[in-house]
Regions:
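Conserved pre-motif I regulatory segment
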Residues: 27-68
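Conserved helicase ATPase motor motifs in RecA-like P-loop NTPase domains
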Residues: 68-71, 100, 194-196, 211-242, ...
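Hydrophobic positions on the alpha1 helix immediately C-terminal to the Walker A/P-loop
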Residues: 78, 82
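Conserved Walker A/P-loop ATP-binding site and its immediately adjacent core
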Residues: 92-123, 232, 324-327
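Conserved C-terminal RecA-like helicase domain
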Residues: 109, 118-141, 185-189, 193, ...
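Inter-Walker segment of RecA-like/P-loop motor cores
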Residues: 119-171
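SF2 helicase catalytic motif II
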Residues: 179-216
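Conserved interdomain linker/interface between the two RecA-like ATPase lobes of SF2 helicase motors
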Residues: 248-335
């Protein structure tokens, strides 16, 4: 099987600047994920960005990069820091394909707007980035070459965030066609790059499906920019044939942060995190009785919440999904609520005998 590797023989190791945008986003990651989590993102992305620049300078390979992350492992946080690093190192335009409907597009837009402190109204008196979204057709149509030149003159990086649908992407392509692109240094982020982006036509050498065609058109307009395809399920992209203009020439792993719990933690039969509930316990719960396994689960939740609280995280949630029928949920809720309320009452009224029993139950759960 062909391996996706390249060497840096065409250029010396690039110097990476960690300037204003990098400092801002890294500080936000420190506040959100702690020093360890933020450093994990920083180290991964600085290395990824450096390798991407080396790849960009190598004329024998494409500028397509496949970024593989695990499900819900913080891929977007990594992309935030990659974007910040790009802005600090001469890139002034990022195109993001942000979902397949207005809700997902809005989530992506709001996430980057909040992270980069982008005001809703463009202010030319500072150098904060600006966002244009395919969801606002009137705004996109109003953008012309003069506006883009003013933004670049003010050192304001530009986000173009598009729904991953042909009509929406065509709006962005039409905008790019209207402007002078000679001063642009762009890169593309294709979130969930294995969904909708790939060419679904049978004869891939001559035909192109609609979304794929718009991506290819955009890449050509931007002069073959860095194209980051991001996914947790990379199989379809890895096996793209030579006809695909999205075929990656490098693959990078987005390392999950410390404490990440993914599929391998919960969906393996021999996992220590899984306890099989007996039919008898399920029937007890349906009948409104508290089975021992649910008591143990709640004790585990209480202990975990206490540890989180000690670490400064004051919000936690537990989901109990024990029956497919909604009609059974009320009985289950009453059972759990009675257990929790009794626990609270024992604490409130300092019921020492009951608290001793509960402490022993918690201790047993903790040392399992």
């Amino acid at each position: 099987m062909e391996q996706y590797q390249y060497t840096s023989e065409y250029s010396e190791m690039p110097v990476i600047k960690q300037d204003r945008y990098f400092s801002k986003i890294h500080a936000k990651h420190q506040a959100a994920y702690g020093d360890f989590g933020a450093v994990n993102i920083r180290d991964n992305i600085v290395s990824t960005f450096r390798e991407a620049l080396i790849q960009e300078r190598n004329p024998s390979v494409s500028n397509n990069v496949l970024l593989v992350g695990k499900v819900q492992s913080g891929k977007t946080s990594n992309l935030e820091l990659f974007t910040a690093l790009a802005f600090d190192n001469g890139f002034n335009l990022v195109v993001i394909y942000g979902g397949y409907d207005s809700t997902l597009l809005g989530q992506t837009t709001n996430r980057f707007r909040k992270t980069f402190d982008i005001p809703s109204e463009t202010d030319y008196s500072d150098s904060s980035p600006v966002i244009f979204s395919s969801d606002d057709s009137k705004q996109l149509l109003s953008v012309d070459n003069e506006i883009f030149e003013d933004l670049l003159a003010a050192n304001k990086p530009v986000f173009l965030i598009s729904m991953k649908r042909p009509a929406a992407m065509a709006k962005v392509n039409d905008l790019l066609q209207r402007i002078d692109k000679s001063k642009l240094r762009a890169f593309i982020i294709d979130d969930e790059g294995d969904q909708a982006s790939l060419n679904t036509k049978k004869n891939k050498a001559t035909d192109a499906s609609a979304t794929y065609a718009e991506i290819v058109r955009m890449k050509k307009q931007l002069g073959d920019p860095l194209y980051l395809s991001v996914t947790a399920t990379p199989q379809a992209i890895i096996f793209l044939d030579e006809y695909s203009e999205l075929r990656p020439d490098a693959i990078r792993l987005i390392e999950p942060g410390k404490g990440y719990c993914g599929a391998e933690s919960y969906h393996l039969f021999d996992s220590d995190s899984i306890e099989i509930i007996s039919d008898e316990d399920q029937q007890e719960l349906t009948n409104g009785k508290m089975p021992g396994t649910l008591r143990a689960a709640i004790c585990h939740y209480i202990i975990s919440s206490a540890i989180m609280c000690k670490r400064g995280k004051n919000m936690s949630d537990m989901i109990i999904h024990s029956h497919r029928n909604v009609s059974n949920h009320s009985a289950i809720y009453q059972c759990v609520d009675a257990f929790v309320q009794a626990f609270k009452d024992d604490i409130m009224y300092n019921n020492l005998d009951a608290l001793k029993t509960r402490f022993e139950e918690l201790e047993k759960c903790y040392i399992r």
